Regions:
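Mg2+-dependent phosphoryl-transfer enzymes with acidic/Ser/Thr/Gly-rich catalytic loops
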Residues: 1-5, 9, 21-22, 197-280
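Active-site phosphate-binding/coordination module
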Residues: 18-129
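Conserved acidic, metal-coordinating active-site core of Asp-based
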Residues: 108-226
Length: 280
């Protein structure tokens, strides 16, 4: 059969809510890879956020930072970064409005002063941190907390792919109105962060632009492509491929444009769809 290229969103798609790759997905992807099909991550995460659990999969490459970074077989073919002065002005705005944030680069994730405490507060949702339930909730994000670098002296402001912000201070619309003409704005890509949170990326850079670039680099027609996703930032990804497959937990916006809907990650959604399309 014709070899396919498959693009995989990570959070809520390849990984379940706890950030783990279900065994059903791991086995199906491995089996499909052995048949010659190619798998690429296509995620809002920057490279520094990709866990070993995900990297252990047989991947041909990745699109990261919401389309700002792309590599094929360890070769970097695309890397977009913020203009330094514009980034510094953005950081000043976030600080002035008491908005916590982290700067995403391939060198690491650089956190604002109170981000760690804010994330723990959000995930606890009123539960005492010393309680058993509280400890379990914090444990679900411990992998992410461990990635955070809290030392401004280590930041290379010339190598930032994206900015994610956790905001409960001002309406999202205020951030959007201030910056949507200058940057690519995406609202609430991580629902637990709250509806006024979001991501800020390079203008006119998203998953579709990166997929188009990658396919052109490989000389592959998009008629042989599939993509799996669950969130708002996967809408453009579905526009770039022949078949867009929404997970059972996908947002309404993505369900409206999906070609198919499969089960949730933990219920074998990826494996079921790969089997349906004859890749395994």
């Amino acid at each position: 059969m014709t070899k396919k290229i498959v693009f995989l969103d990570v959070d809520g798609t390849l990984c379940d809510d706890a950030g783990n790759v279900p065994e059903s997905a791991r086995q199906a992807i491995t089996a499909a890879h052995k048949k010659g099909h190619g798998f690429f991550l296509c995620t809002g995460r920057s490279k520094a956020e990709i866990t070993e659990d995900v990297l252990a999969l047989p991947l041909s490459g990745m699109i990261g930072a919401g389309g700002g970074y792309c590599e094929v077989h360890d070769e970097v073919i695309l890397h977009k970064v913020f203009e330094k002065e514009a980034l510094l002005r953005l950081i000043d705005f976030l600080k002035a409005n008491q908005i916590e944030y982290y700067l995403e680069s391939n060198q690491g994730l650089f956190a604002s002063t109170n981000l760690r405490n804010r994330l723990i507060e959000i995930v606890l949702a009123g539960e005492p941190v010393e309680s058993e339930t509280g400890k379990q909730r914090v444990q679900t994000i411990q992998w992410f907390l461990d990635l955070l670098i809290e030392d401004e002296a280590k930041i290379d402001y010339d190598d930032v792919n994206k900015v994610s912000f956790i905001n409960h201070s001002i309406p999202y619309e205020q951030v959007h109105d201030q910056y949507h003409e200058q940057f690519q704005m995406i609202r609430s890509t991580v629902p637990v962060f709250g509806k006024d949170s979001g991501e800020i990326g390079i203008k006119n850079i998203h998953k579709k632009t990166a997929i188009d670039f990658l396919l052109n680099h490989l000389g592959i027609d998009n008629k042989d492509t599939l993509a799996f996703g669950d969130g708002h930032n996967d809408v453009e990804m579905f526009e770039a491929v022949a078949t867009g497959i929404a997970m059972g937990n996908a947002c309404e916006q993505l369900l409206a444009v999906a070609d198919e809907v499969t089960a949730r990650p933990e219920d074998g959604g990826i494996a079921q769809a790969l089997q349906k399309h004859g890749l395994v």
